[in-house]
C-alpha cells in the first residue's frame, strides 16, 4: 500500500461530504423561497434581525459542542443568511413588478471574463433562469443597447473602494432615459495572468482596463520598466495575452476570467486598498416599484444654484426628513463651465411619505432634479451575534 492511498481515501470522503453539503444548501435555499412566499402573503419584512441573531447564537452554541469556533460559524452562516435575504428580495420584486424570470439579455463591458461580465452573471443567477450575454466595447454602447431595445438590462460599474467613482458612467447617467433598477457589489481580486510558464523578471508589457491599473498602482510601481497598455476591458486584455502566447506579456484581471481564456495566475495582487470592492448598478428602460418589505435605495441627480450654501440647503432637506444619504458625487455640467451636477444615493423607498415630502421641497430649491431610480438595496449588513 502506497503512502498516497490513505490520503486519497480521506479526500474521497471529504468530496462525498461536500456533495451532501451542496445538496443541503440547495434544499435550504428552496425553503428560503417558501419563507419568502409566506412573507409575501403576510406582508412581513424580508429581514428579521431578531430571528437572525437568535439563529446565529443557537448555531454558535451547537458548534461549540462539535468543536467549531464561533468565528467560523458566524462567517459561514452570515453568508448563508445573506443569500436567503437576497433570494427572498428577488422573489418579492418579481411578484410586484410582474417580471418574467425565464430569460434576459444583459449588456455589459467587454467580452466574457470581464468583471462586468462576472457581475452580470451574478445578477442573472439570482433573477433569471437564462442569461443571454451581450458584451460591449464601451460604456456608451451598453447604454445604447438597452435604450434601443437590443438588450433588456445594462450592468455597469459605478464606484470602486480603491479608485473611486467611474466618471464615464456618471456622465452617461446625466443624459440617459434608463432607470436604475438594481445594484450589486463584487469583490475584486486582481491577478497577473500569463499564457504559459514565465516569471516576473521576464514580463515587459501588461495589458488591462485603466481601473485595475489605478487600483494596483502600488504593486506596479515596483516594476517601473513594465510597459502599461490600456484596453477597453479586462477581458480584452486577457484575450490579447492569450493570443500573443508570449512569456513577456501579462494581463491584469480576475482568476475566473483568466480561466475562460486558458491563462494562469502568475501573481495574486493586493490592491492599494486591501478590501477592494466594485459597486455595479443595473439599468432598464422602465423604472420599477420596490416593495416596502424590502430595504430600498433611491438615486437622485440634481443641480443647485451657484449661490453660497445652495448644496448645504438641499442636504438639510434630507436631514429634516430623517433621510440617510449614503453617497454624494459631483460631476461637471458639460457646456456650463464651473457648474456641477450632484448624484445622491438615499437610503429610502421613493414612495415613502418622507421621501415624497423631501422631493417636493428639493424641487422648489434646486435648478433641476431627476430621479434616476429606486431599487432594492443589496447591502445586507450582517448581524453581529455578540
From Swiss-Prot:
The reactions it catalyses are: chorismate = prephenate; prephenate + H(+) = 3-phenylpyruvate + CO2 + H2O
Gene3D superfamilies named in the record: 3.30.70.260, Chorismate mutase, Periplasmic binding protein-like II
CDD domains associated with the record: ACT_CM-PDT (cd04905), PBP2_Ct-PDT_like (cd13631)
Q: How is its activity regulated?
A: Both activities are inhibited by L-phenylalanine.
Residue ranges of every copy of the Chorismate mutase domain listed in the record:
1-92
Domain Prephenate dehydratase: from-to ranges:
105-285
The EC number(s) this enzyme carries? 5.4.99.5, 4.2.1.51
Q: Which domain of life is it from?
A: Bacteria
InterPro entries assigned: ACT-like_dom_sf, ACT_dom, Chor_mutase/pphenate_deHydtase, Chorismate_II_sf, CM_dom_sf, CM_II_prokaryot, CM_P_1, Preph_deHydtase
| Region ranges (Regulatory (Phe-binding)) | 286-386
- Matches recorded under SMART domains: CM_2 (SM00830)
Q: Where is this site: Essential for prephenate dehydratase activity?
A: 278
Q: In which pathway does it act?
A: Amino-acid biosynthesis; L-phenylalanine biosynthesis; phenylpyruvate from prephenate: step 1/1; Metabolic intermediate biosynthesis; prephenate biosynthesis; prephenate from chorismate: step 1/1
Q: Provide the effect of residue 88 to A/E/K.
A: Important decrease in catalytic efficiency and affinity
Cite the ACT domain residue spans from the record.
299-376
Q: Binding residues for substrate, per the UniProt record?
A: 11, 28, 39, 48, 52, 84, 88
Output one GO BP term.
chorismate metabolic process
Q: Where in the cell is it found?
A: Cytoplasm
Its quaternary organisation is: Homodimer.
Provide the protein name.
Bifunctional chorismate mutase/prephenate dehydratase
Organism, per UniProt? Escherichia coli (strain K12)
What gene name is listed for this protein? Answer: pheA
Amino acid at each position: 500500500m502506497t503512502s498516497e492511498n490513505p490520503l486519497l481515501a480521506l479526500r474521497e470522503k471529504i468530496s462525498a461530504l461536500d456533495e451532501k453539503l451542496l445538496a443541503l444548501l440547495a434544499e435550504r435555499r428552496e425553503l428560503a423561497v417558501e419563507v419568502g412566499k409566506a412573507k409575501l402573503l403576510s406582508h412581513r419584512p424580508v429581514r428579521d434581525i431578531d430571528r437572525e441573531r437568535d439563529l446565529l447564537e443557537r448555531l454558535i452554541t451547537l458548534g461549540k459542542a462539535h468543536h467549531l469556533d464561533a468565528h467560523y460559524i458566524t462567517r459561514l452562516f452570515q453568508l448563508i443568511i445573506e443569500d436567503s435575504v437576497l433570494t427572498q428580495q428577488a422573489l418579492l420584486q418579481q411578484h410586484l413588478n410582474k417580471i418574467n424570470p425565464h430569460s434576459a439579455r444583459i449588456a455589459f463591458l467587454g467580452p466574457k471574463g470581464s468583471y462586468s461580465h462576472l457581475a452580470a452573471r451574478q445578477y442573472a443567477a439570482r433573477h433569471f433562469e437564462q442569461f443571454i450575454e451581450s458584451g460591449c466595447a464601451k460604456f456608451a454602447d451598453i447604454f445604447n443597447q438597452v435604450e434601443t431595445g437590443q438588450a433588456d438590462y445594462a450592468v455597469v460599474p459605478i464606484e470602486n473602494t480603491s479608485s473611486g467613482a467611474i466618471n464615464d458612467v456618471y456622465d452617461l447617467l446625466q443624459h440617459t432615459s434608463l432607470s436604475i433598477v438594481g445594484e450589486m457589489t463584487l469583490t475584486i481580486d486582481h491577478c497577473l495572468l500569463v499564457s504559459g510558464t514565465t516569471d516576473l523578471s521576464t514580463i515587459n508589457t501588461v495589458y488591462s482596463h485603466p481601473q485595475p491599473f489605478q487600483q494596483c498602482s502600488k504593486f506596479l510601481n515596483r516594476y517601473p520598466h513594465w510597459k502599461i497598455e490600456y484596453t477597453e476591458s479586462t477581458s480584452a486584455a486577457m484575450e490579447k495575452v492569450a493570443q500573443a502566447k508570449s512569456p513577456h506579456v501579462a494581463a491584469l484581471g480576475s482568476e475566473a476570467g483568466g480561466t475562460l481564456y486558458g491563462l494562469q495566475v502568475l501573481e495574486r495582487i493586493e490592491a492599494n486598498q486591501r478590501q477592494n470592492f466594485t459597486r455595479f448598478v443595473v439599468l432598464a428602460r422602465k423604472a420599477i416599484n420596490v416593495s416596502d418589505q424590502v430595504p430600498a435605495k433611491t438615486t437622485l441627480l440634481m443641480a443647485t444654484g451657484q449661490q453660497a450654501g445652495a448644496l448645504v440647503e438641499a442636504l438639510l432637506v434630507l436631514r429634516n426628513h430623517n433621510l440617510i444619504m449614503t453617497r454624494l458625487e459631483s460631476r461637471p455640467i458639460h457646456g456650463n463651465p464651473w457648474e456641477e451636477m450632484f448624484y445622491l444615493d438615499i437610503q429610502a423607498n421613493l414612495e415613502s411619505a418622507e421621501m415624497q415630502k423631501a422631493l417636493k421641497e428639493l424641487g422648489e430649491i434646486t435648478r433641476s432634479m431627476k430621479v434616476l431610480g429606486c431599487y432594492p438595496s443589496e447591502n445586507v449588513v450582517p448581524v453581529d451575534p455578540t
